[in-house]
């Protein structure tokens, strides 16, 4: 099942800080395809979420903006 809120949240947050999919993928050590799938609402592993959180340098209170009670 596609989680539309997650799809919109990661993409919106990424765009709000003016970072491309390619740049986020590079910083997180992931492929652009992985970022694209997550932005489209596909589930991802906890390790992948951790990489994105670290790459975006999120504070603990900001994590819910992207992964909503999922981490």
Predicted segments with their positions:
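A short, Lys/Arg-rich alpha-helix, primarily the initiator
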Residues: 1-17
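Alpha-helical residues within the helix-turn-helix
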Residues: 15, 26, 54
